[in-house]
Amino acid sequence: DKHVKAWNEISKILRGKEITLEELHTKLNGTPNIQNILYFTDGKATKEELEKYSQKKEEYYRQFCKEDTEKFHLVDGVCEFFDHLKEKDIPFTIASASIKENIDFFIESFGLDRWIKPEDIVYDDGTYENKIAMFHKAADVIGIDMKDIRIYEDSNSGIRNAYDAGCEQIVVICDKENEEEFLKRPGVIEVMQDFSFAKEL
């Protein structure tokens, strides 16, 4: 995962060692950059350092994406799924722990503005306390009550935050061998590997 590789680089710079698998799953996945940098520095990073290393992490991430031409693409079936939602007038948006530079990069790379107005995408602009607040903002953007929203997630912390935000319909994108484990999680109603089902809609 390119985010992991990027955080590894930042971890090596800030504390001279790579991140552990446990840290990745319990502390870093799906959390805002600033929170992760504070974790690496035991809360000692200055405002300037938070900004600097947040930007640097995303520079690493975009660099790794560009280098991996084979795997840098949307999940199978996502385009058809977005087309279906638009066709049926079902409101949707993206809530991402990425910063604006990354969102701009994704919009440009994948043409996301075909389906979603860029200003409707919720991202880490430094004003959100956590991903829960971002989910609430996304619900406001599409004008739907959280209990009626379906959230698609692929990270442990994202699943937990979606549930804590009040979502009762969480769909997890995961490897086949992890399906059983994720189905036991609160709020999870479905698991899948991709959106290929949308090609039949």
Could you say what each language-model-derived stretch is?
Residues 83, 100, 105-201:
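Asp-based, Mg2+/Mn2+-dependent phosphohydrolase catalytic module
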Residues 96-98:
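Conserved phosphate-coupling serine/threonine residues in phosphotransfer and NTP-handling enzymes
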Residues 1-79, 84-88:
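N-terminal helical cap/lid subdomain that shapes the substrate entry/recognition surface
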